[in-house]
């Protein structure tokens, strides 16, 4: 697991240095373009591995019953896709992404938002919890003293409003980058 995290960090740092050096003219931009796709593929695999490894680390926290869910690895992969694509859409305010990348990120972000909402609700209401303590904690979150944070924050501001902004962006080409950046900020 540690090697996955170190590999992901290394690939990310190399990519950042390479793109920065090309942007500043220290290296040929053709070199950056030539290694961009291999770095993307390797980085994506390592990012997904990092999300799954993080879920397994959470699962080892025996005192945290809410983290003892079989959905956790898939949920963290979905959230990694959601947050990663959202951050890249927000970066699109400052750096041109190109139409193909922009469209792909839009779809990944929108689909990940919907799937994450489904998994969140399924995990809270559709599956038995690991223990009675976890069931009571989940009830406190969804119906008890934390219900406003859950429903207004996690569900409303973290999922529904970003989904509405994604839908609005799909019908508003000129304002799409700003709407998607706002949606991304809300999900992070």
Residue map of PLM features:
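Long, contiguous internal "core" modules enriched in hydrophobic/ aromatic residues
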Residues: 3-6, 10-187
